[in-house]
A protein has these predicted regions:
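Active-site loop/lid in soluble adenylation, ligation, and acyl-transfer enzymes
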Residues: 2-131
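Structural beta-strand/beta-sheet cores of well-ordered domains, especially the beta-sheet scaffolds
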Residues: 9, 16, 56-58, 116, ...
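An acidic- and aromatic-residue-enriched active-site/binding cleft used to recognize and process polar
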Residues: 23, 63-65, 141-143, 172-177, ...
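Helical (often loop-to-helix) elements that flank the catalytic cores of nucleotide-handling enzymes
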Residues: 31, 73, 79-95, 147-165, ...
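Short beta-strand
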Residues: 60-63, 169-175, 215-219
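Short, conserved secondary-structure transition motifs
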Residues: 68-69, 180-188, 218-234
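Signature for HUH/AEP ssDNA processing cores
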Residues: 101-174, 185-193
Length: 249
């Protein structure tokens, strides 16, 4: 249960006092899940969840009015934030920049939920080296009518392609409709090269399973499961492992 002080309500997490607001606010109206329920969930899965978000800059995807309203994507971390939440400055090709939130522990997870986040969306880089990703990400995006079995079959093909090139593929079921596959890589290559590598993976998956998968860029040309390589672009984030997705079911 949250405690109270002269400064308002807070939740004790890992020795940190996390300021919270409106813990009883309903986030998922169909099933009655509240903000406090989400906080408890992320504390319970913190060990696993932090493997995907710790020390990484992340966009705050805020459902300030619950999942029935559109999310607000906030790149800039609030100026007023707890000491246990850091920020890393990302500079974009447009010439703009943003200091994005970086969390390190379970208290940071609770802070993100209190900000209105349902899912967590980190970049594939760590705060100490923003130019070189340490993850290659493959997003399997099913076209309408595609069944789950086909997505899984494509995932196995993608795993084979990655393993043929010396990479270990990890499945991640935190996609809203499809499937994510991650491979950890050395922090040696810039985003451009990592994206090109992911594009090559996608094309090879299509070559090996043309009846199941596509790497076609234009939506009207796609059939089956789209092997989305563009999630490796500099400005892209993907929902992390153990993320709750903002869907009614």
């Amino acid at each position: 249960m949250p405690a109270s002080s002269s400064k308002g309500q807070y939740l004790e997490v890992g020795g940190q006092q996390v300021p919270i607001t409106s813990p009883d606010k309903v986030v998922f109206p169909d099933i009655g899940v509240t903000k406090m329920d989400l906080m408890r969930y992320y504390v319970a899965v913190a060990e696993g969840a932090l493997r995907g978000v710790r020390d990484r800059p992340m966009i705050l995807k805020r459902f300030v009015k619950g999942i029935t309203e559109e999310a607000v994507f906030q790149k800039r971390a609030p100026e007023k934030r707890p000491d246990f939440v850091d920020a890393a400055e990302l500079k974009y090709a447009s010439g703009t920049s943003a200091k994005e939130a970086v969390i390190h522990d379970a208290a940071g997870l609770v802070w993100a939920v209190n900000m209105g986040c349902v899912d967590l969306n980190p970049h594939p880089v760590r705060a100490d080296d923003l130019a070189h990703p340490d993850e290659l990400r493959v997003d399997l995006d099913p076209m309408p009518g595609v069944q789950w079995r086909q997505i899984v079959d494509v995932a196995f093909v993608a795993r084979e392609v990655l393993e043929d090139h010396g990479l270990t593929a990890w499945p991640k079921t935190s996609g809203s409709r499809g499937f994510h596959i991650y491979a950890r890589i050395q922090r040696r290559w810039p985003f451009k090269f990592v994206r090109l590598a992911a594009q090559s993976v996608a094309r090879e998956v299509e070559r090996r399973a043309p009846e199941l998968a596509t790497a076609r860029w234009w939506k009207e040309e796609r059939e089956g499961v789209f092997v989305d390589f563009n999630q490796n672009a500099f400005d892209r984030t993907v929902a992390s492992a153990y993320s709750v997705r903002a869907t009614p079911d």
